[in-house]
């Protein structure tokens, strides 16, 4: 009887671990280190992100590798379906339409259909950061197919690194690696998400 209980608990534990569907705090700030590679180009950048889940919007600003940190910012507002590309120094702004769903952007959350692929620890002993990894696939209306692997902290589902392999309709491949650091729950400066008057006009 004891053995049956142990086996049942082990099965339940495995089922819980293998289930996706978790999200980090609904509002946060973080730096994103981005690497994009395809057959013709390689791009790297370090951006600052402000994520406002309840209002379905987020901001990416600057690129410290090109000395643009703080001078340019893009605000993606999915409730309005508009993105604002803002140059703070030049006081200029352009807009472009947004498509798709907010929750599918930046792969911040682990979706329900994600498959658990293993766990790991960064560091050692009591100072180790324990993490879980998942894998899932997405097909987009434009024909792109994506295989996504993501690693998040065991506690609070905070993203650590996401790797996306994309194949377009013509068969071309690209690799997108997104790493997070200096993660801070909540929004330190909500004014960064305000649309300036010269952009609304």
Curated annotation (Swiss-Prot):
Name the UniProt record assigns to this protein: Ependymin-related protein 2
UniProt note on tissues of expression: Component of the acid-soluble and acid-insoluble organic matrix of calcified shell layers (at protein level).
Subcellular location: Secreted
Signal peptide stretch: 1-21
Organism, scientific name: Haliotis asinina
Keyword list, A-Z: Glycoprotein, Secreted, Signal
GO MF annotation list: calcium ion binding
Superkingdom of this protein's organism: Eukaryota
Principal place of residence: secreted
Sugar-modified residues: 38, 137
GO cellular component: extracellular region; lysosome
GO BP annotation list: cell-matrix adhesion
Glycoprotein in keyword set: yes
PANTHER family the record matches: MAMMALIAN EPENDYMIN-RELATED PROTEIN 1 (PTHR10697), RICIN B LECTIN DOMAIN-CONTAINING PROTEIN (PTHR10697:SF13)
Residue interval(s) of motif Microbody targeting signal: 199-201
Family under the similarity heading: Belongs to the ependymin family.
InterPro entries hit by this protein: Ependymin
